[in-house]
Curated annotation (Swiss-Prot):
The protein's role, per its UniProt record: Required for the insertion and/or proper folding and/or complex formation of integral membrane proteins into the membrane. Involved in integration of membrane proteins that insert both dependently and independently of the Sec translocase complex, as well as at least some lipoproteins. Aids folding of multispanning membrane proteins.
Subunit architecture: Interacts with the Sec translocase complex via SecD. Specifically interacts with transmembrane segments of nascent integral membrane proteins during membrane integration.
Primary gene name: yidC
Family note: Belongs to the OXA1/ALB3/YidC family. Type 1 subfamily.
Spans through the membrane: 5-25, 333-353, 362-382, 427-447, 473-493, 520-540
Name the UniProt record assigns to this protein: Membrane protein insertase YidC
Length: 579
């Protein structure tokens, strides 16, 4: 490689490291705004140290519903097992049957199983804050356990008779083969009975962390909404700080997520706005969130009904996209203008298509690396030949540098002439690498957050979505990490071999240093990245090494440039008659 190429590669490596540091959660922009409307938001706050009044005393006309017997009902379909409670008509447990935690055990996604996750929240006109999880409903359905499969459907209905004129009815609808749950709310007799004529339907409590590395999972946890055509994100990434976001308008959904799973509330009608809240616990890295839709209640009609869909399941791109509400926007694929298109329109479709024929994602990654190499082959072939020509030009270039060492302007002019005559581009060596960067960054996002690779192994790597660690130190080495991963080591070796066999335009000490420095920098960068990304870059480098061997073996002397070292201003004297 010539000096400009190596400089370009070094800059790319530095960009990688700076980019990784920039994308770390500590440096992400923090969304922390004050709410616009505060009736319901501030009502949820509890004054520290204030004595708690008996629940019934705080509920007004709802006081009689604050006592009762809790009845649990479980619905199991092909994909999950959901437990509902008559206390609050809420969800207390969601266990996914096809997805285990980092210890390969089943787990409950609901982080607040005692009080439940889903509820209605509103303020009555007499100033009482009502959270339906404090109230005992009556279950119309008698089954305590119902098993569904395929296209079978089942409905559970809860009713709360507040007064002879006022009632709340909540209905859940399940199907046998879907993560989607129908959720219907019917308020009777509440016209002009609620402050602002509105209520919130909310999921309270961040999703339980499923992975071994809790700190890493906290980097992916957030609450969000798709409001007015744009994604609103709340990331409670700092300890001991409260984050809150409240906006008015039409929302397609509100949701909260951990690394690989999401709980979303999807309205089937107009909304008044959204409310998001979050807080991080330092000791456990757990980020606790609340996501709510603000809904209006008719001031004139005695009955107000709203229908919703709940999605509680994996963050599988194809699954959430099939919902048709842009829920896939909650998946982080990087910059919308650069890396996200690569992820959504190239990587994920290619992986999905190949997975129809190949079940092992390690093999899919190898095939994908080969396909990318074939696509970039013409460009990389031209680039490599350009570098080989640059190597052949070095004696001539050194002669010019010595000849015009005191005239930089003349030297640059002559260098430009020689490059033009030889048909080479001094920066051509790093062009294929630069063009790969958006794809490489997009693959980083896909491999880091896509559930497709989770718990899929290849060779010694047990999980392609995390580093392929073979030894954990128990302590962290600055810039390297707390473990040894194999794919990055092999990848760094292939980078070194590729540089070794690639024509080098310079032979000075700086070039020798770069030959060792660049692989070392790549090793540091990839050691903490998903094993799938390391495997991809390793295989791409192996294909590049094979290509370089082929070029070296087939390039002949006729392919090398033949340039005139004379200056562009030198001209032969015209012949004339001798005198």
């Amino acid at each position: 490689m010539d000096r400009n190429s190596v400089t370009g590669l070094a800059l790319i490596a530095m960009i990688m490291i700076v980019w990784l540091q920039f994308m770390s959660p500590e440096n992400k922009p923090k969304l922390r705004t004050e709410p616009v409307k505060k009736e319901l938001a501030t009502s949820a706050a509890v004054t520290p140290g204030a004595p708690a009044a008996p629940v019934g005393d705080n509920l007004g006309i709802f006081a009689t519903a604050s006592a009762g017997a809790e009845q649990l009902q479980t619905v199991e379909n092909d994909l999950f097992k959901v437990t509902l409670s008559s206390k609050g008509a809420t969800i207390k447990s969601v266990v996914l049957k096809q997805h285990l935690d980092g210890h390969l055990k089943q787990f409950n996604l609901v982080s607040t199983p005692d009080k439940g996750a889903l509820s209605l929240l509103f303020l009555s006109n007499d100033g009482k804050k009502i959270d339906t999880r404090d109230l005992y409903f009556r279950s119309v359905s008698l089954d305590t356990l119902k098993t569904l499969s395929g296209t079978e459907r089942y409905v559970i209905r809860y009713v709360l008779d507040v007064t002879p004129e006022k009632a709340i009815a909540i209905t859940y609808g399940f199907s046998g083969n879907s993560y989607r749950i129908d959720y219907d709310v019917k308020l009777t007799g509440f016209n002009n009975a609620l402050v602002g004529n509105e209520y919130q339907v909310q999921w309270d409590g961040g999703l339980v962390y499923s992975e071994k590395n809790r700190e890493d999972e906290s980097h992916n946890a957030l609450a969000g909404s798709y409001l007015g055509g744009s994604f609103v994100k709340l990331d409670a990434s700092k300890d001991k700080e409260s984050y809150r976001e409240e906006q008015s308008g039409l929302a397609k959904w509100v949701a909260l997520r951990n690394k690989y799973f999401v709980a979303a509330i999807i309205p089937r009608g107009a909304t008044e706005g959204i409310f998001l809240e979050g807080r991080k616990t330092a000791a456990t890295h757990f980020e606790d969130y609340l996501a709510a839709l603000k809904m209006s209640v008719s001031a004139t009609e005695p009955v107000s009904s709203n229908s919703y869909s709940l999605y509680v399941g994996p963050l599988d791109y194809n699954t959430v996209k099939s919902l048709g509400v842009d829920l896939e926007k909650i998946m982080d694929f990087g910059w919308d203008w650069l890396t996200r298109p690569f992820a959504e329109y190239i990587i994920l479709p290619a992986f999905t298509w190949m997975n129809r024929f190949v079940s092992n994602y390690g093999l899919i990654i190898i095939i994908f690396a080969l396909l990318i190499k074939l696509v970039t082959y013409p460009l990389s072939m031209a680039s490599t030949k350009s570098m080989k020509k640059m190597s052949a030009l070095q004696p001539a270039l050194k002669e010019l540098q010595e000849k015009y060492k005191d005239n930089p302007a003349k030297l640059q002019s002559e260098l430009g002439r020689i490059y033009k005559e030889a048909g080479v581009n001094p920066l051509g060596g790093c062009l294929p690498v630069v063009l790969q960067m958006p794809l490489l960054f997009a693959m980083f996002y896909v491999f880091r957050s896509s559930i497709q690779l989770r718990h899929h192994g290849f060779l010694w790597a047990k999980d392609l979505s995390v580093p392929d660690s073979i030894l954990d130190f128990g302590f962290a080495i600055p810039m390297y990490g707390d473990h040894i991963a194999v794919f990055p080591i092999l990848m760094a070796i292939t980078v070194f071999v590729q540089q070794k066999i690639t024509p080098t335009a310079q032979s000075n000490e700086q070039m020798k240093i770069m030959m060792y420095m660049f692989p070392a920098m790549m090793l540091l960068f990839f050691n903490n990245l998903p094993a799938g990304l390391g495997l991809y870059y390793l295989m791409f480098n192996i294909f590049s090494v094979a290509q370089q061997f082929y070029i070296n073996a087939t390039t002949t002397a006729d392919d090398m440039p033949n340039v005139n070292l004379g200056t562009s201003s030198s001209k032969k004297k015209k012949a004339g008659p001798k005198k």
